[in-house]
Each structure stands twice: as C-alpha cells, then as structure tokens.
A protein has these predicted regions:
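Charged, low-complexity, helix/coiled-coil-prone segments
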Residues: 1-9, 42-49
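Short intrinsically disordered terminal tails
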Residues: 1-5, 68-75
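N-terminal acidic leader/helix
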Residues: 2-35
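Short, charge-rich amphipathic interface segments used for partner binding and complex assembly
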Residues: 32-73
C-alpha cells in the first residue's frame, strides 16, 4: 500500500467514525425523547403529535430499508 493510499484510508476511516459518532448521538437523543413520549401531553389532543410521529417513523423506516435493502431498495 502506498503512503497516499494509506493516508486516504486513514482519512476515510476518520470521516466514517466521526459520522458514526454523530449518528449514535442522534439515536441516543431520539431514544431519550421516545422514553419521554416525545414530550406529548396526554391531557391534550394528540393529533399533531401523532402526525409528526408518523412522518418521523416513515423517515426512519426508509433509512432502515436502505441499510437492510428492503422494499424499494431490495436487490
């Protein structure tokens, strides 16, 4: 492996690990928010929260489908 190739590999690994750390932090935030029911107040109408959660779930499902190659991303 040339020095340039090795540096490129190191840089790409560093970039990947930085993005993974960011991803993991976002997942931790979402997990905590989920445990708190995303701040929804059960004493009030929840249609807005239900609509938001439906949209967020669809986005997360799309991400999972991309990673696991399901649905429209199936090979």
């Amino acid at each position: 492996m040339t020095d340039r190739t090795a540096r490129n590999q190191e840089n790409s690994l560093a970039a990947f690990l930085a993005k993974k750390a960011e991803f993991d932090a976002l997942l931790a935030e979402l997990t905590q928010a989920s445990a708190d029911h995303f701040g929804a107040d059960p004493e009030t109408g929840l249609w807005g929260e239900a609509a938001w959660l439906s949209d967020a779930t669809a986005k997360l499902k799309d991400i999972a489908d991309q990673h696991f190659r399901r649905g429209e991303y199936a090979a």
